Amino acid sequence: MKRSHLLSLFLIGCSLSASAQLSKPQVDLPDPLLMNDGTTRVENLADWTIRRQQIGEMIQHFGIGQKPEVSPEAIKARMVGDTLIVDVTVGTETLTLSSCIRYPNVGQPPYALMIGTSMLSLPKQLFESRPIAVMNYNEAQVNDYTQGRWRPRHERGEHNFDRLYPHLKDNGAYSEWAWGFSRLIDGLEQLGPEVTKIDVKRIGVSGCSYAGKMALFCGAFDDRVALTIAQEPGGGGAASWRYNCGVDSVENLDRTDYHWFLESMREQFHGDSVYLMPYDHHELCAMVCPRALLMLGNTDYRWLADEAAYVSLNAARKVWEKLGIADRIGYSINGDHGHCQLPESQFPEVEAFLDKFLLGKSDIDTNNILIAPDHFKKTIDLNKWIKF
């Protein structure tokens, strides 16, 4: 199994030169292109690879907890019919993941694959005429926390992940869910396209709401994902913690679900202390670079904090622009539809990203898919937040 492409991003014991909060408050967004030494700036993809690692370390250290690496020998994958089963063994403990792959009725294998975090919320008609397989990632097999009571759930430190990594019992769910997602891709790689009928170079991930956040973390922390579509991810996803500080009726750092994050994040960065945070979520978005990212918003739900996401995405776009690949990031923010109910008006943006980044149609134009309400553009001063 090829592992070099994972950049050794998230090894246990990786040093954190930015393991402390900022020495003084910074209201505007931290520069994603500035290295931890405070002087060196990213000039090319090689530099960005290093900077991306630094950002990933900060997000784990302060925000979600560690996403541990797994040796290839710990993975044992098999197909039972159309179901992918992956056993992950760490020490004496084994965790089993299973996900059914639904293959398209058009095209020839190996197929591109879109993985839905928890479930694929994008409308099925987007896939019916495209040679893209779909699969849902059952995150409860790793960490079964849910805000609702529609299924039994365990508390922090009691999940299946914690059997394998008891020393990481304080982790937030998003690090653990991202870990499990990566193990599914490990399984696909191990078996190969002859067995799975999947092209692992054309994998996408998408989810909505809490699962939109999950999709963003999964795509950011695994560079084998070609396309990330984060649908209505809200605060803790694409939205800037800084922008949301003190804003009423939105999900901000003081009003999020801390089963998802490290409790220490709230202790360190509550209230105005958020301005001491050495990163923000425009940098989580930027971690997807140089791959493709599309964010879908819904202004009908103020809790989703789309204004803050608008700021974050424009800030993150600076990284793609620096590398000359700004066609790989876009956003589409509108309203007049239900939560996680993608309207037909947003189909063209999604179709363009699917066709270009999963199906390889290079003639598709994804430049300047930057769709937001006019009042965002008129009332939000991007220069106040983006000074790099």
Label the predicted regions.
Residues 1-21:
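Bacterial Sec-dependent N-terminal signal peptides
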Residues 21-98, 103-109, 289-291, 298-388:
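Alpha/beta-hydrolase-fold serine-hydrolase catalytic core, especially in secreted/extracellular enzymes
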Residues 112-114:
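Hydrophobic beta-strand anchors of alpha/beta hydrolase catalytic cores
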Residues 116-201, 234-243:
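Cap/lid segment of the alpha/beta-hydrolase catalytic domain
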Residues 221-226:
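Conserved hydrolase catalytic core segment
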Residues 227-284, 305-313, 321-326:
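Mobile cap/lid helix-loop segments that gate and shape the active-site cleft of serine hydrolases
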